[in-house]
Structures are given as C-alpha cells and as structure tokens.
Amino acid sequence: MLKQTAGKRLPFHICGEANGLEEEREQITELGSAFTKGKNGSVYTLTIIGQIEGHQLAPETVKTTKYEHVMPLLAQIEESDEVDGLLLLLNTVGGDIEAGLAIAELIAGMKKPTVSLVLGGGHSIGVPLAVSAKKSLIVPTASMTIHPVRMSGTIVGAPATFQYFNRIQNQIVEFVAANSGIGKQKFLHYMMATGEMATDVGTVIYGKEAVSCGLIDRLGGLSDALETLHRMISARNRREKKKSVEIS
C-alpha cells in the first residue's frame, strides 16, 4: 500500500533523503517499482506481473498486481514534476478484465512519455496493457496469448450472458485496435482461432509475429526501451520549451 506523504512529496521521491536507499528498496519490494534520475531525465519504472487482481482476492500462492495500488500511483506519476517518463515492464498471465482495462485506460490517457516492454509473457488482459503505452516493445522470446473472454465459476447459461461476454470482448478489441497497428478483424482472427492451442481457443504469438502483425511497435530489450523513452522525453521537453518561448 502506498504511504501517506506530507505536502506534494511522492512516495517514490528518493533524491536528497537520508534514508533514500531504504525507501527505494521498499518501493521495489512492495510495488515492484523504482525511480531513477539521470542526465536523460527522471524515469519511473513500474512492473506489472502475474495476475491482475480485481475485486476478488487471488490465492496467496499467486503473484499479483493489485489495481488499487497501481491506479493512484499512475495519477501521481502523471501529476508529478519529478517524473519525466514511465517505463512499464510486463510479464502477465491475465486476470480481472475490468481492473486490467482500467489500468490500461489510465496509461493510454497519460500525457507524459510512456514505453512498455513485454518480457516473458503478455497474456490475455496483458495485451491491452502492453499496447496502452505510447510506444511498445517486446523481446524476441516473449509470448502473447490472445483468446476470447472467459469467466471462472458458475454462470447463467442464457443468451444474455453470452451477449454480455461479447460486449466486453468488443471493448477489448476496440481498445487494442485504437492503441496499436493491428486491425480489428486480424485481432479477432487471432482471438477466435481453433487450431493453435490444444485445449483452448485463441492464438499464442511471439516477439517477431507480434511486431509483424502490428500489435507491438518493435522488437527490443531494456536498453532499447530506455533509449526510446529518453528520446520521447527529449522531444517533449523541446516542445514545451518552444511553447514557453512563444508565450513569452
């Protein structure tokens, strides 16, 4: 849980603090996040891993990303003068659709430079999270699973239930198509494929295919993601400087 801080100080402020290293380690342990300040700008790194936990608590044995932690943190990052850009490191197995889409919508709505890097996996609701950043990268060995909306537990076997599923699914398709280079029909083709997975409907795509189909912007690793983010930060700073000169 995020700590309450005095004034406008953010929980990730580490510069000039006597206990800065201890606070930084605590942020990495509790939130899987880190704040770094260098000559190319200040970057906040946030990991989104495991299962996206929504309104229902996941079992203690499952690694999760809690939406009630991430959402206020994203708002603070957007508002803070200390942070120039956001780097998202993704390795997800899916999770709560509403919670995942809520996080993805927040990221997509940020004005600050954002870059996502898919590592290991970006499965299910991890796909909208991956494309929510302004630039997305994927390592060659990472995989992304695209499948229809599913619900665990008992459901009512009525037409209205399947209509509800279809409406949620359309929201995901619309979001992914709007925030990436893949078309709706192509994404639906991957989602509804029946010959790709032995026990499920859908498709598993890897790094190169994710880029070639337009889902992810480019192949790359950590240094590539940081380089992309630094370029975006520099471009934004130049635009703001030019705007301030014109106003004055």
Residue positions per predicted region:
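N-terminal organellar transit peptides
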Residues: 1-127, 132-147, 151-248
